[in-house]
Amino acid sequence: MKALLALSLGLISPLAAIPANTTLTLVNDPTFNKITVKVDPGSGLSDTDVTTLTGTVQAFFNVNPANGQTTELTLVNGRANGTNMNFARTAFLNLAAYNINVTNLSAAINTIAPPGVVTPSTGIFAANQHRFDIDQGTITGTTSGLIGNNAINESFTPQNPASGTGTGNGTVVLTATGDSGIYRNYSVTATFPVSIADTFLVGTTSVAITANGTVKAAGTLQVPRTEYLAWTVAQNIPNVPFNGDPDGDGVSNGLLWALGLNANSNPLPFLPRPNPAVPRGFLVPLPAGGTAAPILIQSSPHLATWSPAAAVSPVANPIPTGTSGNVTIAPDGSPRRFVRLLVTEPL
């Protein structure tokens, strides 16, 4: 004779990374968000000016609340607005001159191929994962003499930007500032150098533009303290007890989460049952989307003591996170056997 039992118990398991996002604001700092721009029409007539950036960028992270480390920094819909600039030079006894104004400057900041990857132990990332494109702004002015007599009226647009990327390494730092209910709070700072090298035509003269500086943005971030709590937030039932069973079906909230199900899902198709192909064997059919946490299969001949089930295949026991499809438990020779699923609550 065989019997089945599916439970979820509130023990302890290591914490995994949790997705979170926030809006970062470019900081007002004399050493950051100052982009030095150089224009060079040739003939030794280069000039430089500095634009100060303000703006925001949405940032996505994958945070381990146990240590405040992230494996991801993805930047989306960033907008950095720059102050106006003027470039003017006269040389060769007034035989060559220009006066150029750049106004209403703005740059888009985005991750090129999300997700942006961060080394979690150091917070360092390759800055060239992120774009910095000047895609708004007007260039007006004149050139004369040896570099041509031209009126300048050009625009940066998304179709005609001055394109650049991050350069070298950037850093992202998360500093825990305390807990608020089910959330862990962080202050966040992301810093990365940027560089642009582009050209535009003024008449027949090619004017080179280079820009270099370091972008720094900061903000605050809230992350659920555990991946189970993150699931409760996503299910619109924040902080419901891990061992709670609101519908009385014998399957706890924690087991629903670990199975990769929604709070209102029917768990019965995914619980242990006799394996019709193997007498006295068991079968655990897992959801196609994969499990969300390790699940330990335990067995007992009499319910008094439990031990990890042996001969589990095709995966190890505990069942690893992300497992889908059928997991089988071979017979152990007992005339009577109970099987249960044990899930441990993250710290």
What are these regions (language model features)?
Residues 189-202, 323-328:
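Low-complexity, intrinsically disordered Gly/Pro/Thr-rich segments
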Residues 224-347:
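Short, composition-biased motifs enriched in small/polar/acidic residues
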Residues 15-32, 222-237:
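Boundary/junction segments of secreted and surface-exposed precursor proteins
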Residues 174-188, 219-221, 303:
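A short, structured loop/turn motif at beta-sheet edges
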Residues 133-134, 182-196, 213:
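A short hydrophobic beta-strand element
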Residues 1-20, 347:
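Sec-dependent, cleavable N-terminal signal peptides
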Residues 194-221:
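Acidic, serine/threonine-rich low-complexity disordered tracts
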Residues 29-181:
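Predominantly extracellular/secreted and cell-surface proteins with exposed
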